[in-house]
Amino acid sequence: MALPSLGQDSWSLLRVFFFQLFLLPSLPPASGTGGQGPMPRVKYHAGDGHRALSFFQQKGLRDFDTLLLSDDGNTLYVGAREAVLALNIQNPGIPRLKNMIPWPASERKKTECAFKKKSNETQCFNFIRVLVSYNATHLYACGTFAFSPACTFIELQDSLLLPILIDKVMDGKGQSPFDPVHKHTAVLVDGMLYSGTMNNFLGSEPILMRTLGSQPVLKTDIFLRWLHADASFVAAIPSTQVVYFFFEETASEFDFFEELYISRVAQVCKNDVGGEKLLQKKWTTFLKAQLLCAQPGQLPFNIIRHAVLLPADSPSVSRIYAVFTSQWQVGGTRSSAVCAFSLTDIERVFKGKYKELNKETSRWTTYRGSEVSPRPGSCSMGPSSDKALTFMKDHFLMDEHVVGTPLLVKSGVEYTRLAVESARGLDGSSHVVMYLGTSTGSLHKAVVPQDSSAYLVEEIQLSPDSEPVRNLQLAPAQGAVFAGFSGGIWRVPRANCSVYESCVDCVLARDPHCAWDPESRLCSLLSGSTKPWKQDMERGNPEWVCTRGPMARSPRRQSPPQLIKEVLTVPNSILELPCPHLSALASYHWSHGRAKISEASATVYNGSLLLLPQDGVGGLYQCVATENGYSYPVVSYWVDSQDQPLALDPELAGVPRERVQVPLTRVGGGASMAAQRSYWPHFLIVTVLLAIVLLGVLTLLLASPLGALRARGKVQGCGMLPPREKAPLSRDQHLQPSKDHRTSASDVDADNNHLGAEVA
């Protein structure tokens, strides 16, 4: 960044002096975490050309909230406001619209919605909330339908959407929310739809419901209060015998001075058919337990935002990854966390003890009575007795909570959505890769090494308006992540390997999708070939892979420059040598020749080195980055003069050279004028101004003690006698004898003014 232009007189040097004296010490450090959790190594701002992105939008459409990937991975189905779209995502770049079918709310429903005091500009529409693949020929969709939920089947023909028939639209109550702002979830399992949403217009009746298929329709019982009235559902994940629902609600088992929100996981059995006499058309296998995501000794992250399942070869080792925030703000900022929960731990908790409500004390305690058979939530095939169902009605809350493993904790950010995949490195090890959408429209790519905490590879600002990410859909076959926003859909390639221009930078990135190809000398997407590519996911140290091996390893070794940029000095000017900060995790310093430039003596502005041409300033200047214990030159300059050229160091003879122009700032006249000019006036002016500054500082320091002394004097003067009257008011009045006046503390107001009240 170029400096402001300086004048042609002695004031030029004064401005340089004050620039160094006042501005440079106030600049923020180049890097550092500041206790906010892991920092993204690379950050891309909105519109940055170094990160290839593509954006799909359709005129007249808003709220691209619901995303569904086809079975072959080539089509992305999108549920927007009053429309369903089919996008072709086979080719890189902007997704291509295959076709679109409208599904607006009827005019009658919109009129009724407005009559109920809802906005006909933002609320009384059909927001698509459920979009699942029913079979090879049909999709199943549900929407808010102007606060009157509706569902329908959408026929497919060669992945194209056929128009919706009005007579095929069904009641969607219990499957889609009434209000578009209410959270919801739905999953299709074995032809049956399991949904969690709000079941009434007011949004005060949460429900878990099963519809479609051959099994009877089942739902939770609102009168038994299995769910709190403010329950908010975020995910539904099927397992072998059960379906898990993830949600948050106000806790009823804790006595707290304020409402405490708790994240939960609930289960229902797939083979549940309801009760015969008790709990007819109701779940008989409903259980719920608390989810705990917290660091030791810290407040828990108690509000769940999203959850996904990462399948494994064995279901017993599969894990659920969930995003949490906290209802408390520590340090005035929001925080987020990602925790992993084992399916084995969830199953163990649901096989443990129950809690029961003591009706006398209205407190939840551990149930210590005898077990009933069949055990509630056991998914037994036989019918349950009335005794077992009666027990189940009151014992639906588990005593133990499911403890998650914190993988990523970061303050100053609110994660809203999550997508997870497993990536295999060159060494064959598997690494969890998480894509995290934020409330400000950015996307974080995080990697979880084996038995370690996550680190952030990059941060990409998608939305220029900082609006939240509404949905994420991973498309592994296309190597991309799709992010839904109110105005459209962003396509984000899941890796950006080409931005790493050297083996050092490629290895330090520790991106499992990228590796260095020594033949093409490019950082490229990792393929299934067995080429001798370079990658170090475990250590991320270029000394092990970018050199000939561990024998060449040296703890103080610095790699040679790959390119030297030649710069010619100009008399009477300030030379600015820029240093691009490729990594936010590195620390940077400048060196001149083989010596490190002291930070105290160097003039560095925003990472750039400022040089005033004079004798001895020529030669090799390098901006050196140190990351993960490894130092490497980010940029190298050979500063030379036209009048007195320097000979290049023989060790740098084989390094390519390039003549470049760098920013210059004029500070004086010609060379001959500068040589004849005396700097005595400059010294006097600087000395006088510095004395004025010091005098002002001393005045400020002395002002506070003097003010305190004056205030003390006013307080001490409050006890003085008031002046006597010089003459009586009338002839009948006589002078009263003098009394000893004493003033109480209450006789002095906040401004040390005497109130005139006397105390005998």
Swiss-Prot record:
Q: Which UniProt keywords apply?
A: Adaptive immunity, Angiogenesis, Cell membrane, Developmental protein, Differentiation, Disulfide bond, Glycoprotein, Immunity, Immunoglobulin domain, Membrane, Neurogenesis, Signal, Transmembrane, Transmembrane helix
Tissue note: Expressed in neurons and glia in the developing hippocampus.
Stretches assigned to the Ig-like C2-type domain:
572-630
The cysteines covalently paired via disulfide bonds are: C113-C124, C142-C151, C269-C379, C293-C339, C497-C514, C506-C523, C579-C623
The UniProt entry's GO biological process terms, in alphabetical order, are: angiogenesis; axonogenesis; negative regulation of angiogenesis; positive regulation of excitatory synapse assembly; positive regulation of inhibitory synapse assembly; regulation of cell shape; regulation of endothelial cell migration; semaphorin-plexin signaling pathway
Pfam annotation, one family: PSI
- Domain of life the protein comes from: Eukaryota
Residue ranges constituting the Sema domain according to the UniProt record: 36-494
Q: Where is the composition biased (Basic and acidic residues)?
A: 723-744
Q: Which residues lie on this side of the membrane: Cytoplasmic?
A: 704-760
Q: Where is this region: Disordered?
A: 720-760
Q: Name any one GO molecular function.
A: semaphorin receptor binding
Report how it sits in the membrane: Single-pass type I membrane protein
Signal peptide bounds: 1-32
Please give the knockout or disruption phenotype noted for this protein. Results are contradictory; one study finds no visible phenotype; mice are born at the expected Mendelian ratio and are fertile, but they present defects in T-cell differentiation and in T-cell responses to antigens. According to another publication gene disruption leads to degeneration of photoreceptor cells in the retina within the first month of life.
Glycosylated residues, per the record, are N120, N135, N496, N606
Q: InterPro entries given for it?
A: Ig-like_fold, Plexin_repeat, PSI, Semap_dom, Semap_dom_sf, Semaphorin, WD40/YVTN_repeat-like_dom_sf
Outline what the protein does.
Cell surface receptor for PLXNB1, PLXNB2, PLXNB3 and PLXND1 that plays an important role in cell-cell signaling. Regulates glutamatergic and GABAergic synapse development. Promotes the development of inhibitory synapses in a PLXNB1-dependent manner and promotes the development of excitatory synapses in a PLXNB2-dependent manner. Plays a role in priming antigen-specific T-cells, promotes differentiation of Th1 T-helper cells, and thereby contributes to adaptive immunity. Promotes phosphorylation of TIMD2. Inhibits angiogenesis. Promotes axon growth cone collapse.
PANTHER family in the record: SEMAPHORIN (PTHR11036), SEMAPHORIN-4A (PTHR11036:SF15)
Q: Indicate the family of this protein.
A: Belongs to the semaphorin family.
Q: What is this protein called?
A: Semaphorin-4A
The scientific name of the source species is Mus musculus
User: Which gene does this sequence derive from?
Assistant: Sema4a
